Design a protein with these regions (language model features):
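Short alpha-helical elements
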Residues: 1-230
Length: 230
């Protein structure tokens, strides 16, 4: 995770000198535990048992593009980065602790692409961890300003604090917006920077969505364990 080295370059002899363990075996079990949901269950359990250590006075929503060098599932050309990328939507708490994420989407799509499905995935993990979403204040930038998203949040009784996008041209209806609360949105930038400290997540080399997602669950867990000092 930290060095981002290739699977075949794992330093196994230094740690398992008395046993014969190959990088193929390590990857086999990583893939197996990714596909059977083990890393997701670990993350849900950590959240469930340490909810009091989260700051849910507000949550922050944002998308993040990661360059992909090897292609694979949900990879597409992103003009702003002039490269192939994968986009993921993340949710963090008011301290910058990542909470949940949606499935990767191809880089050519904007943050609102399949937003209903993405939000269901994000909220679904919180529900599984017995974290109540009703009444949460959610900050999001103008890229998320859409009637569809606002309606979804309203139905879930989540208070969306979304910066208006002037290009939408919808000035007839006054929308709730708290500028002071919105200043907390920088925490998602902090959270993404912490993820980028893992070189395995800085550039995407995993071709399968399932292994890419579970590398993130592993990173979420490592960062949270450091925070709560278990």
């Amino acid at each position: 995770m930290k060095t981002g080295c290739q699977w075949r370059e794992l330093s196994l002899k230094e740690y398992f000198s008395k046993e014969t363990i190959s990088w193929q075996l390590v990857y086999y079990y990583f893939s197996k535990w990714s596909k059977d949901g083990s890393f997701r269950r670990i993350w849900i359990s950590l959240l469930q048992n340490n909810k009091r250590k989260l700051d849910l006075s507000s949550v922050q929503l944002d998308g993040s593009h990661t360059r992909s060098k090897t292609g694979g599932e949900s990879v597409g050309y992103q003009g702003r980065k002039s490269s192939n990328t994968t986009n993921c939507i993340f949710l963090c708490d008011n301290q910058g602790q990542m909470l949940s994420m949606g499935k990767p989407i191809s880089g050519e799509h904007h943050d609102l692409y399949n937003i209903e499905e993405t939000l269901e995935e994000i909220v679904g993990l919180l529900d599984a961890a017995d974290i109540e979403v009703k009444g949460l204040f959610l900050n999001a930038d103008s890229g998320f300003d859409s009637k569809k998203l606002r309606d979804i949040l309203y139905k879930k009784e989540i208070i969306g604090n979304i910066k208006e996008n002037p290009r939408n041209g919808d000035t007839k209806n006054e929308k709730y917006f708290d500028n002071e609360l919105y200043k907390r949105r920088f925490k998602i930038e902090k959270a993404n920077a912490w993820l980028d400290s893992f070189k395995a997540l800085l550039i995407r080399f995993e071709t399968l969505n399932v292994t890419w997602i579970n590398l993130h669950y592993l990173a979420f867990s490592i960062l949270f364990l450091r925070k709560i000092k278990v």
